[in-house]
Amino acid sequence: MGIKSDRWIRKMAREHGMIEPFEPHQVRHGDCSSVISYGTSSYGYDVRCSNEFKIFTNINSAIVDPKNFDQNSFVDLVSDVCIIPPNSFALARTVEYFRIPRDVLTICLGKSTYARCGIIVNVTPLEPEWEGHVTLEFSNTTPLPAKIYANEGVAQVLFLGADDVCETSYRDRSGKYQGQTGVTLPKA
């Protein structure tokens, strides 16, 4: 598997709608200030976080069970900023909608700007022929509240081209997160 370049990313986004909306270059400045960068980089694409958040709370003293997740464990927030409580986490989604080609697998890594503040961004790989908004998981590993900025960069997607096309894609097996929009909670 080889990593795909900025030229390939731009071509696939423009000709095949692989990323929508798409920013063909790296954006580092907003209207009046600097932003955490997003858009096409040399060998990846830096995604933005939308303004839709689900902040984890334990007001119901629930047990976290991935097979039976209680959605009442979250507080919904629509805002340009999300404050994650100490030692807690929040879910969000990307601004961008992805359509992954059949011969590509992506790996997503959190941006160092957040990691250096103790904020870990986790995203599972985007599998061949998966499509949707990416659900982002933010973990605040610090004993202090942590801030996430909507519409700014949060993670980088790396596109790995396969040497051989897979027999069964995510779409073929009707993956449970296929076509997801909005912030999607765990499904068992």
Swiss-Prot record:
Swiss-Prot/TrEMBL GO biological process terms: dUMP biosynthetic process; dUTP biosynthetic process; nucleobase-containing small molecule interconversion
Tell me, what is one Gene Ontology molecular-function annotation carried by this entry? nucleotide binding
| Active-site residues, record numbering mapped to chain | E137
Q: What are the UniProt keywords, alphabetically? A: Hydrolase, Nucleotide metabolism, Nucleotide-binding
Q: Name the chemical reaction catalysed here.
A: dCTP + H2O + H(+) = dUTP + NH4(+)
Q: What is its EC number?
A: 3.5.4.13
User: Which positions bind dCTP?
Assistant: K111, S112, T113, Y114, A115, R116, T135, L136, E137, Q156, Y170, Q180
Look up the record and name the pathway of this protein.
Pyrimidine metabolism; dUMP biosynthesis; dUMP from dCTP (dUTP route): step 1/2
| The organism's place on the tree of life at top rank | Bacteria
List the PANTHER family hit by this protein, alphabetically: DCTP DEAMINASE
State the similarity comment: Belongs to the dCTP deaminase family.
Quaternary structure note: Homotrimer.
Function description: Catalyzes the deamination of dCTP to dUTP.
**Would you tell me the protein name for this molecule?**
dCTP deaminase
Q: Which organism is it from?
A: Methylococcus capsulatus (strain ATCC 33009 / NCIMB 11132 / Bath)
